Amino acid sequence: MKFNRMTLIASPTPKAQKAAEELKKLYQWYPLEEADVIIALGGDGFMLQTLHHLLDNSFNLPVFGMNLGTVGFLMNEWRPSNLLRRLIRAKQFTVYPLRMDGQTVSGEQKIYRAINEVSMLRETRQTAHLEISVDGRIVLPELVSDGVLVATPAGSTAYNLSADGPILPFDSGMLALTPISPFRPRRWRGAIVPDGSIIDMRVVDPDKRPMSAVADQRELREIANVTITLDRTTPLHLLFDPNHALDDRIAREQFRLC
């Protein structure tokens, strides 16, 4: 695909800023409001910040990231040369964020979105007690654990994988429901549910066992209940080099030993 107006954003790290200065000398750049594609320099955390900025400001631009961070799962290899050619050959992936509708013990209501995962986490040394429902049916009357998370395929290789959750193929149409350090039920290690599911979580005894809900980096404390769905009204578009596309990375990640 061909793009005519690139805009450049970079992480504040010295490495990313140096790379940005190099690119500014090589190509013509436009303000975000006039651009048709975003070039993002940084790591996965910066990419998440960029995508959330697009969500919050209703921008619908594809993003081509180049890794100047650590892992760079959502990024392409950093190479300053042939950028326009890479954009023409790039493979586009559309990802949909999770929508978290949360209500606190005091009645405050918030809506947050997450590209990777929504996590429910205990706030104190007390283990969390949660009731979990899927599509209006109680599937776990009481989960005793440090918490639980719901991950998208794009986020299944992040916190979800660290919690021993499954890696989801990009086109699986599924979400991972993964407990964090579960105690009871002893044999429950999580579930995979269709991405059209409505997942409800209710905190049992929130006064004694308070919990927070976290949508990527956004936290809502003293949570009473949350509803999690996939928001298909706000698509996000990521661009990848053909030989390093997101679905290939997710597939390869399943066979990594370290």
From Swiss-Prot:
UniProt KW NAD keyword: yes
First-listed, main subcellular location of the protein, grouped into a coarse class: cytoplasm
One GO location term (cellular component): cytoplasm
GO terms under biological process: NAD metabolic process; NADP biosynthetic process
Job description of the protein: Involved in the regulation of the intracellular balance of NAD and NADP, and is a key enzyme in the biosynthesis of NADP. Catalyzes specifically the phosphorylation on 2'-hydroxyl of the adenosine moiety of NAD to yield NADP.
Family designation: Belongs to the NAD kinase family.
PANTHER family membership: NAD KINASE
Record protein name field: NAD kinase
